[in-house]
């Protein structure tokens, strides 16, 4: 069995994570006490991917919950599925990181990290064939961003050959949570570029837009946003959990999606989008699903794929459907919009089909795209970063925890390099000879 160990860090990560476990338990017929009440053998066939079977037929999530303050943990514990998790797997401090990346990465977080790693080892040891780790966290805060990236680099040292995928909530253009978000996000990207295999980027603003525009919710709550996120996360992992005609696992996904090691930030989309209360009354067809999931309105990240080109993308269908029809639709999309796909990676769209649809739907699809348009996000963060860093605003909070200004400068230039790499591949054509001239590449990046 190919198991995944799930880690959730910080307030955002724990809220998304606990929603994800609600949805996944529901799909596998697990009730809040960990008992199985399903109606199909398929629910149990690969349940080991995310659950351990404990005594007397109880299923326990392979989840590690960490935070630097007890608040969020308490609300997870008090929530509907709070009794599902293993009590030892709640690891928390008392101080809080106070949205300070340095506290999460260097001081408070560093004190707690060893007890988290003990739990990670314990979970990893109980796996037959550990496939990899997934982390849910935000990039703008202190714990999820600072301590989350610290955990990634520690786990990387210990399990260098296992896939590390993250679901990272990136700062939104309009909805800002804290003033120092650009600092925290830039420092996080600096780490994720080096230490993660694949990052699925999510963004509150895009999620709000989906709630307003598509779901017609007037006052969306974080619960609604997290519902969308959990649908997408479940979609990306469904072929690990259920049998299907064309399966893909984390490693296959990484191999197909990452053409260059640093460019591993993906956008995810989901179709059909339904609000929590009302599932749609009419079943969608494969062409409609395909068209919807490539639609920029369905992307959970505030960057417009039409402003860039797809290096690669993967579409995961769920439900009973014909493989032939899926292939035709994929081909159709690529042929009609060929200018949006780089021509120097032929057949860069991968489809996979999983036979079991999500609860309440006949079919659904999850879209994962590696597009150069994601540079819009990094550009936006970099601009805000530079504006504050030029005046050294708020820096004392970080230097006070022992950080050096040099680290900020490095993170900033790493971010700018990332943007110019995306730009370089967006402009590249199949005919051109080899490498760009070094000077040219730098000039392009500055514009």
UniProtKB/Swiss-Prot annotation:
Tubulin is the major constituent of microtubules, a cylinder consisting of laterally associated linear protofilaments composed of alpha- and beta-tubulin heterodimers. Microtubules grow by the addition of GTP-tubulin dimers to the microtubule end, where a stabilizing cap forms. Below the cap, tubulin dimers are in GDP-bound state, owing to GTPase activity of alpha-tubulin. The lineage of its organism: Eukaryota, Sar, Stramenopiles, Ochrophyta, PX clade. It is found in: Cytoplasm, Cytoskeleton. CDD domains: beta_tubulin. Mg(2+) binds at residue 69. InterPro entries: Beta-tubulin_BS (IPR013838), Beta_tubulin (IPR002453), Tub_FtsZ_C (IPR008280), Tubulin (IPR000217), Tubulin/FtsZ-like_C (IPR037103), Tubulin/FtsZ_2-layer-sand-dom (IPR018316), Tubulin/FtsZ_GTPase_sf (IPR036525), Tubulin_C (IPR023123). One of its GO terms (molecular function) is GTPase activity. Residues 429-447 have a biased composition (Acidic residues). Keywords: Cytoplasm, Cytoskeleton, GTP-binding, Magnesium, Metal-binding, Microtubule, Nucleotide-binding. There are at least four genes coding for beta-tubulin in this organism. The keyword Chloroplast does not apply. One of its GO terms (cellular component) is microtubule. Its cofactor is Mg(2+). This is Tubulin beta-6 chain. GO terms for biological process: microtubule-based process. The keyword Plastid does not apply. Belongs to the tubulin family. GTP binds at residues 11, 69, 138, 142-144, 204, 226. Residues 426-447 are annotated as: Disordered. It comes from Ectocarpus variabilis. Dimer of alpha and beta chains. A typical microtubule is a hollow water-filled tube with an outer diameter of 25 nm and an inner diameter of 15 nM. Alpha-beta heterodimers associate head-to-tail to form protofilaments running lengthwise along the microtubule wall with the beta-tubulin subunit facing the microtubule plus end conferring a structural polarity. Microtubules usually have 13 protofilaments but different protofilament numbers can be found in some organisms and specialized cells. PROSITE patterns: TUBULIN, TUBULIN_B_AUTOREG.
């Amino acid at each position: 069995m190919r198991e995944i160990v799930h880690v959730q860090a910080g307030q955002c990560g724990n809220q998304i994570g606990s929603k994800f476990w609600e949805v996944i338990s529901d799909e596998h017929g697990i009730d809040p006490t960990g008992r199985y009440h399903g109606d199909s053998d398929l629910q149990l066939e690969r349940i080991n991917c995310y659950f351990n079977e404990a005594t007397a037929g109880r299923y326990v999530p392979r989840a590690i919950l960490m935070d630097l303050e007890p608040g969020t943990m308490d609300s997870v514990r008090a929530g509907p599925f709070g009794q599902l998790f293993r009590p030892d797997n709640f690891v928390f401090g008392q101080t809080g990181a106070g949205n300070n990346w340095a506290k999460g990465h260097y001081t408070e977080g560093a004190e707690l990290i060893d007890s988290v790693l003990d739990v990670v080892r314990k979970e990893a040891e109980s796996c037959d064939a550990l496939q990899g780790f997934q982390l849910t966290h935000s990039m703008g805060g202190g714990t999820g961003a600072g301590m989350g990236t610290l955990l990634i680099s520690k786990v990387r040292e210990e399990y260098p050959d296992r896939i590390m995928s993250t679901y990272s909530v990136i700062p939104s253009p309009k909805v800002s949570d804290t003033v120092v978000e650009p600092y925290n996000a830039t420092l996080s990207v600096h780490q994720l570029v080096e230490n993660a295999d694949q990052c699925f980027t999510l963004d509150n603003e895009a999620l709000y837009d989906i709630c307003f525009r598509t779901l017609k919710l007037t006052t969306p709550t974080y619960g609604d946003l997290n519902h969308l996120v959990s649908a997408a996360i479940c979609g990306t992992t469904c072929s690990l959990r259920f049998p299907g005609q064309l399966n893909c696992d984390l490693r296959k996904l990484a191999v197909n999606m990452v053409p260059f090691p640093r460019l591993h930030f993906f956008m995810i989309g989901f179709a059909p989008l339904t609000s929590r209360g009302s599932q749609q009354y009419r079943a969608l067809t494969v062409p409609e699903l395909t068209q919807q999931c490539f639609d920029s309105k369905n992307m959970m990240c505030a960057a417009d794929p039409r402003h860039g080109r797809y290096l690669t993308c993967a579409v995961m269908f769920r439900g009973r459907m014909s493989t032939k029809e899926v292939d035709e639709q994929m081909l159709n999309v690529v042929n009609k919009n060929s200018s949006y796909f780089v021509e120097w990676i032929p057949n860069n769209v991968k489809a996979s089909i999983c036979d079991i649809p999500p609860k309440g739907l006949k079919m659904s699809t999850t879209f994962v795209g590696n597009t150069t348009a994601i540079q819009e996000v990094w550009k936006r963060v970099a601009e805000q970063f530079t504006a504050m860093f030029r005046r050294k605003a708020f820096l004392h909070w970080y230097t006070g925890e022992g950080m050096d200004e040099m680290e900020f400068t490095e993170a900033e230039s790493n971010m700018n390099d990332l943007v110019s790499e995306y730009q370089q591949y967006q402009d590249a054509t199949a005919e051109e000879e080899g490498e760009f001239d070094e000077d040219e590449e730098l000039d392009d990046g500055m514009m």
